[in-house]
Amino acid sequence: MNYNDPLEPAMIITKVLSKSDIVGNVVLPKAEVMSVLTRMNVNDQDLLNGVEVQVDDIMEDDLYTVTLKVSGIDKPKYYFGTGWSTMKHSLDLSEGDVLKLYWSHLDNKFVVLNFQYSVLPLMIPV
């Protein structure tokens, strides 16, 4: 991913975390996930079984593997299952925090966009 290129808004998932997201699995906003799915090359059956995806925290240089799943057919709910617990604790997320993820289709992974506490270092050639 070239971090100098503008981000595609349709590839961003934003979620204000609820108590149930912190205690259990995080349910992701349906419309935003469906937009990202257009670039993920997965089908409904894949999601019912669960698809392992990587989530890259470029600020801390951490890479997480989480399972993206869907439950229900008539009213689908998209969520992170396995791996979410490790990720939320490592990112020190709590109720009311905003989780912001960008799907980098070129790298085939999510990138954490929670930069509010850090500043990206400038790369100055020497």
Curated annotation (Swiss-Prot):
Superkingdom assignment: Eukaryota
Matching SUPFAM superfamilies: DNA-binding pseudobarrel domain
Record keywords, A-Z: DNA-binding, Nucleus, Transcription, Transcription regulation
GO molecular function, one term: DNA binding
SMART domains associated with the record: B3
Entry keyword annotation includes Secreted: no
Cellular component terms per the entry's GO annotation: nucleus
Localization, UniProt: Nucleus
Protein's UniProt name: B3 domain-containing protein At5g54067
Originating species: Arabidopsis thaliana
